[in-house]
């Protein structure tokens, strides 16, 4: 991915109001923290330059107004978005409870899974005020694949169950996807894990994107070979 255009990665920060979206944007791009809450009006964005494995990437980080749920999922808003950081406040249980609604709506706008979604718990510095435990997060969004393996065994043993499970899987595809989210805890105030968050999600994005990029190159080479063969004839 040496092409400069390919090295621009659009990241969208989403979540309920006052979960720390603007604080994360400011900390990531300016290495600053503002303790006074200033709600975002419309859209705010900035850039962050990162170098990973000798390659420079320009992160275009967007902070979108939280209460305008409909426009967030507009195709124009999500256009070219590669990564979504879905934030909730560790000291606010309702912000965590809203995550599933965000994911359900995102699933409708991201049917091809072209956008990678990461779950981020904010304000980890406020330990005494924490309302969301790691166990809550793990049980709801980052379960392992043991259940999937058990379901596969049951499907092999019973065709009827297989059909039923397929229907359930179609109806609950969101839950299956949501149970495999990558999760991070950060503090924009203390600058804890912020750099690690962005390094990790870019690494993960590149890992997922590389096979697609290589496949595009292969397809282009195949077309080139076909064209050359035609001229040779």
UniProtKB/Swiss-Prot annotation:
Top-rank taxon: Eukaryota
Chain ranges for the short sequence motif Effector region as given in the UniProt record: 37-45
Pfam family, one: Ras
SUPFAM superfamilies (alphabetical): P-loop containing nucleoside triphosphate hydrolases
Bias-annotated ranges (Low complexity): 144-180
Gene3D superfamilies named in the record: P-loop containing nucleotide triphosphate hydrolases (3.40.50.300)
InterPro entries (alphabetical): P-loop_NTPase, Small_GTP-bd, Small_GTPase
Keyword GTP-binding among UniProt keywords: yes
Coiled coil: none
Region of interest called Disordered, as start-end residue ranges on this chain: 143-182
Key words, A-Z: GTP-binding, Nucleotide-binding
Keyword Zinc: no
Sites where the protein binds GTP: 15-22, 63-67, 122-125
Annotated CDD domains: Rab
One cellular component term from this protein's GO annotations in UniProt: membrane
GO molecular function: GTP binding; GTPase activity
GO terms, biological process: exocytosis
Family the entry assigns: Belongs to the small GTPase superfamily. Rab family.
Protein name: Ras-related protein RabV
Gene: rabV
